[in-house]
Structures are given as C-alpha cells and as structure tokens.
C-alpha cells in the first residue's frame, strides 16, 4: 500500500484513505506519500525530556487546492484526535533515524517515530523539499503578483501571500500617512471639484480683522442679570392688578354668573375680587398715593384697622358673633346703640368721617361688587328670596329681651340724636337719593357736636370702620375690643339687610312699615329677629388697598370727596387749636 501510494498508482485503499482525509479537510486534492506506522512525541521544556502525546497511526502527506498547498496528517488509531500540520516556510525538519524532528511556527518541537526506517528517510527528504519550495515561493512572491501557478493545476490564488503583501504595503505607507498641509497653490484654488468650507455666520468685522483661530464666528450668548430681568418686569404686576377690577366693572351686568363663581358655598357672602391675586400689588403704586390716602392706609392715631386675617372673626351665616352678641356689618350714624361703644378722641372722629365719606361716595363700591343689583336706581324692588348681600341699607334690630331700666334711659337719650342713613350706591349715574357732599358734612358735624354735648361724655359715639369692597361687610373691631365689661348687660345686636324701594318721601323697607316723612333718613331699629342675618368675611388690608387704589385712579368724584373731607378735617383741627 505504501509503495502504491508513493508511486502514485491508483488503488482501492488509496481511494478510501483520500475519502477519509477529505472528511476532515475538503480541500485535499491528492495523497503524495504514506507511512504505515508512526508515533508522535513532544518535547517538554520544563522536564527537558520527550513526552508521548497519545497520537499514533498512519501518516499521510498530501497536496491541497487552497493555501497552504501541502500538509501532513497522522490518523490516530487510539482516539478521534488526529494530528494535522500544514507545510509552510516556517517549518524546520531534522532527521535522527528512526525519528524525524520538526519545529513549527509556534516554536513547538515534535518528534515522529517511524516503525520502518526507510519510510523515515523518505518522508524526511520529502518534507525538506516541500519546505524549501515554500520558502522560495515566499521569497519570490513578495515582489510579484499574489497569484501563483501550481504544477499542472492551473492558476490559483495564494491567500497567505496576499495577506503578507498587504501587511508590508500597510507598514510602508504608515510612515507617510499623515496629510500634508494645504497651500495656496493654483491646483487647489482652480479645482472646481474641490468642496470648500463655507462659514455659517460670517461677520464683516472678522473679514476686516482677518481670521482669528481662537474665536468662533458665533456670537457669545448674552448673560442676563437679575437686575436687568426684573427691571423690565416692574410694570407688569401693576397692570395685572388693575385688570381684574376693570374687567369686572365692565361686566357687572352679569352678576348672576359671577355669584356662582365667587361664592360657591355661602349664598349671603360675596367673595372679594382681589383675593385671587392679592400679592400682585407692587411698591411703586403705593408711592403714588396722596398724603391723605397714605395716612388713611398706614393708620392714623385715631384709626384702628381691622385684623388682616378673616379667620379671627366668626363668619358663619345666620349666627351672631360671639363677642358681645354683635354681628359684623356696617353701622350707620345715629344708631340708638351708639352709646354702648367706647369713648374715642377727636382725631378718631375725624378719621371715621373720612371713612364715612368713602361709604357715601357714588360708584365707589359697585365696581368691585359683582353681586350688586343691576337696576337703574339705588333702592330697587328685590324679591324676598334673593341674596341678602344685594341690599343697600343696614339696620340694627332691637334686643331679644327688654333691657335694664338704666339702659332704657340711655336709649332715650341716644335716640334723640339725628342720624343719616347712607346707602351704598351701585353706580354714579343710578344714585339720585345720595346726599350732596356739603350737606353730608354739615350733618356729620351736627351729629358730632350733639354727641359731645351729651350728658355722658365717657360714652361718646364711636363710628366703626365699614367698607364693602367686593360686596362684603366688615365686622366692628372697636365694639369687640371696647365692650368686654358690658357683655352681660348689653342685648344682642342683629345686623339685617332689608331690600328697599323708592317712595315719595325717601326709602322704605320692603319687609317693614313705611318710614315717616320727617324721619325717613334716620336709622330705625327693626323688631323682626327672625329675618335672615348675614355674617360676612372682612376685607384684608391688601384687598382694601386695591379697592381704594382702583377708585382713586378711575373715579374722579371719589377723589374729590376724599380731598374735600381732608380739607374739612384740617380746617376743623385748626379751628379747635385756635
């Protein structure tokens, strides 16, 4: 079999061996030589001795249709692991009969033991010839085409030579791979196919100054400071503060819709319009006020402002206030219960006269009252089932039980005092019953003089602060703070709002009797305790401030009344000092 394989003659055993080899390597084309019995050993570098690998069997030398062109394989009889080694230029063979030693490209040393020494010499000679031919091809193929010609098999491609050549060319070109600097040559400037970069934002200043490598064409972003940012928005809060009032003053005819939006729970209390944005009032608006209003807002020695927090008061509808049995609500001048309030100084009376002018100013409250009636007159006919907040005149009802005899005498003394029932008008045009300013001031002066001439100077009448911005009534702080000692003796006071209608002699309450002609402008006590009562939320300081500011800016008549009251108080003070 070995002779037949060596001579290249066809045989049945040769075909079986070739088929078995092609199962492991399909590129094997033919068998060149065969050794019947060999064993493979490896040299151990640590032990410095030969070690058996467990591979022994028949050795086949063959040619391949692909690179590498030659190789040998030991078909192992002991196991399924065969030993295959390609024949390349890196192999180094040495004959030591009956051993054939060789070293491969990984510098591993192996020894093949041959059972037949003649086979050992023949295979050793063949291995050396094939290795030398591979080395010659590698030397000549480095400068020639990677395509090589095999003996008698046509034109084939050497993959290893192609990879080697590509590596060499890459190594040579790596030294000069850096691009050269572009110059202003004519070849570059005149080339139409050359794509030149175009600046994104060219500026004329950069063209004149020349290219600056450290600066970009994009402008630097502007950094806004907090001063510049808030300086531009100083006027915005002022405009936003005035807008809600003008909007509701323009649409005051749609008061039913505003009632549903502003007072979802309490039907007798109208929420303030300025409570939506109470903090939008800026400081420059306060600086534009006249001295009289600043004195009124900051609090003069005679003025006692109400608490700014409405939570300090009892505001449940239909129940009297716990402090002395007093219900919050505006108090008209000349009330028979004025004798129960504490003593006030002359400056206090002058300050309250200013506030009474605020109440009597036409069109001063309706702009902030979405719940006011839309009729053309001040006192219009209102259905009994409507909201009590729509009424325009406030009365104090009589006591629940007969008072003490001492207090009855007090009532007789105070009942003789003249009074003026000042109604809060809806607008300037729809208030024909509002008294002129001079007549109102004259009557206020008469009331004040008669109160000073009363036999009980220690209990002079004090006019509490009352304002109805946004359709709400303020409670009486002075009565709560000054009448703690008289709570057990004083009867409960009830503030009721009765709708009015016009008569020939003046105003008449719908639910009571018609007022006499001589006393149509006096405040009368009502005996109907079962009528509906309203406890409203007081205005905060910011809400009152916004209401006054809006009236000063938009209503000239309001400002004129305040100024006349201010002049009158100054002249009265000068007369008293002289």
UniProtKB/Swiss-Prot annotation:
The modification Phosphothreonine is found at residue 380. Pfam families: DCP1, mRNA_decap_C. Residues 248-257 have a biased composition (Basic residues). It catalyses: a 5'-end (N(7)-methyl 5'-triphosphoguanosine)-ribonucleoside in mRNA + H2O = N(7)-methyl-GDP + a 5'-end phospho-ribonucleoside in mRNA + 2 H(+). Keywords: Acetylation, Cytoplasm, Hydrolase, Nonsense-mediated mRNA decay, Nucleus, Phosphoprotein. The modification Phosphoserine is found at residues 144-145, 274, 335. One of its GO terms (cellular component) is P-body. The modification N-acetylalanine is found at residue 2. GO terms for biological process: cellular response to interleukin-17; deadenylation-dependent decapping of nuclear-transcribed mRNA; nuclear-transcribed mRNA catabolic process, nonsense-mediated decay; protein localization to nucleus; protein localization to P-body. Residues 187-222, 246-265 are annotated as: Disordered. It is found in: Cytoplasm; Nucleus. The keyword Mitochondrion does not apply. Interacts with DCP1A. May play a role in the degradation of mRNAs, both in normal mRNA turnover and in nonsense-mediated mRNA decay. May remove the 7-methyl guanine cap structure from mRNA molecules, yielding a 5'-phosphorylated mRNA fragment and 7m-GDP. This is mRNA-decapping enzyme 1B. The lineage of its organism: Eukaryota, Metazoa, Chordata, Craniata, Vertebrata. The gene is Dcp1b.
